[in-house]
Amino acid sequence: MRKNEYVNLPVICLVGPTASGKSGLAVRVCRRLYVDEHPAEIINTDSMVVYRGMDIGTATPTLREQRTVVHHLVSILDVTVPSSLVLMQTLARDAVEDCLSRGVIPVLVGGSALYTKAIIDEMSIPPTLSLIHISEPT
């Protein structure tokens, strides 16, 4: 994200443990902002909610919640696809940038402060070992 490009729009972050009511609160916040003529969309920053079929164990937002407010990064990956902090950072930053460019307030919702911090701060994360090509000595 380009720093200070969208200084007039806030980025709201809701972080807390699984099943603590974050999704419901985020929907209420977005609906209230809409009433006040400030459109808002929810961006998932939870490392497990990105996976399809993990609804119960991750307290994935209900279909009703997802129909009430636009949600990004919910149930987008098959459970066989590895995810990482770097992938989530990239996908979520793209979603935040998209929202801000349309004048929409992004509401980040997740269980890990690390993931949310990686998205909103200037945090540089090295790739995982599985993504690094290691040369054999000759």
Predicted regions mapped to residue ranges:
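Hydrophobic anchor at the beta1->P-loop junction of P-loop NTPases
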Residues: 14
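P-loop (Walker A) phosphate-binding loop of NTP-binding proteins
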Residues: 17
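Extreme N-terminal, non-catalytic leader segments
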Residues: 1-10
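N-terminal phosphate/diphosphate-binding loop that engages ATP/GTP or pyrophosphate donors
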Residues: 23-108, 113-131
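Residue-level detector of conserved catalytic or cofactor/ligand-binding positions
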Residues: 132-138
